[in-house]
């Protein structure tokens, strides 16, 4: 029996730097129509990114200072915030710099967010 490779089997990947989170194309797909994102940490110390539509942002019930822009490019997307990366580095005890730290990602359909799996 032949097991054919398909693009759907590719893994999403996030790369962390001192100034941004970069998502590969696979991890970026759920964010193609996002206006902004919220980023946080879950109880397992994984990074959680939730896409927010323009309608959700304009409802006014979210603190605009906690919403971040996501830049979508043809082969990747990027969330830039030195403050965010300092927070993540401190909380997760990660040495973030110009050298990349790469982690696998998982899209959680039921929660409508992307999880960056931080394994130590």
Regions found by a protein language model. Name each.
Residues 1-2, 7-10, 41-44, 48-120:
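Mature exported/compartmentalized surface modules and terminal targeting/interaction regions
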Residues 1-28:
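N-terminal leader/targeting helix
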Residues 20-26, 32-33, 37-40, 48-52:
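Long compositionally biased, domain-poor regions of proteins
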Residues 14-16, 32-34, 42, 109:
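Short, surface-exposed loop/turn motifs at beta-strand boundaries within globular domains
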Residues 18-32, 77-87:
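Short beta-strand-centered segments at strand-helix junctions
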Residues 12, 28, 37-38, 104:
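Beta-strand elements of modular eukaryotic interaction domains
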């Amino acid at each position: 029996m032949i097991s054919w490779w398909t693009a759907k089997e590719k893994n999403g990947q996030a790369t962390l730097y001192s100034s941004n989170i970069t998502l590969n194309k696979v991890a970026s797909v759920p964010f193609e129509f996002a206006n902004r994102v919220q980023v946080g940490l879950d109880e397992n110390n994984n990074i959680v990114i939730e896409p927010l539509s323009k309608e959700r942002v304009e409802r006014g019930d979210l603190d605009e200072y906690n919403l971040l822009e996501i830049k979508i490019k043809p082969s990747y997307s990027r969330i830039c915030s030195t403050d965010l990366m300092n927070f993540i580095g401190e909380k997760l005890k990660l040495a973030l710099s110009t050298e990349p730290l790469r982690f696998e990602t998982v899209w959680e359909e039921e929660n409508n967010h992307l999880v960056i799996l931080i394994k130590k």
